[in-house]
Amino acid sequence: MIKNPKVLILTAHYGNGHVQVAKTLEQTFRQKGIKDVIVCDLFGESHPVITDITKYLYLKSYTIGKELYRLFYYGVEKIYDKKIASWYANFGRKRLKLLLQAEKPDIVINTFPIIAVPELKKQTGISIPVYNVLTDFCVHKIWIHREVDRYFVATDHVKKVMVDIGVPAEQIVETGIPIRSSFELKINSDIIYNKYQLCKNKKILLIVAGAHGVLGSVKELCQSFMSVPDLQVVVVCGKNEALKQDLLGLQEKNPDALKVFGYVENIDELFRVTSCMITKPGGITLSEAAALQVPVILYKPVPGQENENAMYFERKGAAVVIRDDSEVFAKTEALLQDDMRLLQMKEAMKSIYRPEPADHIVDTILAENHVEPNHIPIKSPALAQSFT
């Protein structure tokens, strides 16, 4: 039995999702009395220049680099073999060896497809349990390695795909994707309407525009939606200050029709009162939407995991997928007017959601390593007041 295990969580800053999952798992371990938890951006620390370049290319995949990313994602999936695995395993390997020697973790968790640890296990024979937490509603072969002890996945569909690839079913646990605990709290919606100055007698359309300009023509969209009766548009610009300032002029003209925010710390509050949301199909965003049963309109998914996520939610009846700018207004307005379909989409979201995924994952890991959790109760936070 390990009394005070040290946990190493490896992640990467490609989008916010992988890091957010790592932080959620870290917080969950700490809540259960496991204090020695380290979160490391292995690629960023090992190869900062290469990481900056690849992060730039990743962001460009939203605009000019879609075909390049399609080729990378699906091309690597088709030709992935031992040579590619060996080449990829060298990324971060030197830093990893130093990290393992210095920290001597008892448990390693990947929230990004980093195969350096299982590859090191294979080559050196070190005995350390390795867990992969998949952060999308699909699986790429790059996540899979014989030396990974267990995989935590979003859905039974992902599990079936992995079994077909050759992963033993007993190594895969369907838990859902870890999300922030705030999305699983109960909050009085009246408080939210008052806090954000929203109209209870209007439907609310939430547009999550993001900080990297991944949602096109936001201003024009807002102008169109502002003409729809009994609709209030809420735009979250993230850290895109230029977009926020551009939209504030529209808000001043008709504050009852449009509300503009920058970065919203407790965005779950807006999820709770929206009728539907326009967003990109990231795995964490979709998991959060499923937790609060928010129908989603998925805007122009990038080829790769975004497209796979979007197709899964579309098949389940939980999402409308937009692949052309000209479709956004008409399809969104039609959905907002169709209460029956909105209800069906909410039910579909409910069927996808898996409650308390972070707890499920952490409890499983601790049980497998014979650790007795010492749960530290945490009071439910008061409704956050900070948003910009």
Swiss-Prot record:
Compartments it resides in: Cell membrane
Keyword RNA-binding set for record: no
Pathway the protein acts in: Glycolipid metabolism; diglucosyl-diacylglycerol biosynthesis
Entry's EC annotation: 2.4.1.315
A Pfam family the protein falls into: Glyco_tran_28_C
Gene Ontology terms describing biological process: enterobacterial common antigen biosynthetic process; glycolipid biosynthetic process; lipoteichoic acid biosynthetic process
Keywords: Carbohydrate metabolism, Cell membrane, Glycosyltransferase, Lipid biosynthesis, Lipid metabolism, Membrane, Transferase
GO MF annotations in UniProt: 1,2-diacylglycerol 3-glucosyltransferase activity
PANTHER family, per the entry: MONOGALACTOSYLDIACYLGLYCEROL SYNTHASE, MONOGALACTOSYLDIACYLGLYCEROL SYNTHASE 1, CHLOROPLASTIC
Protein name per the record: Processive diacylglycerol beta-glucosyltransferase
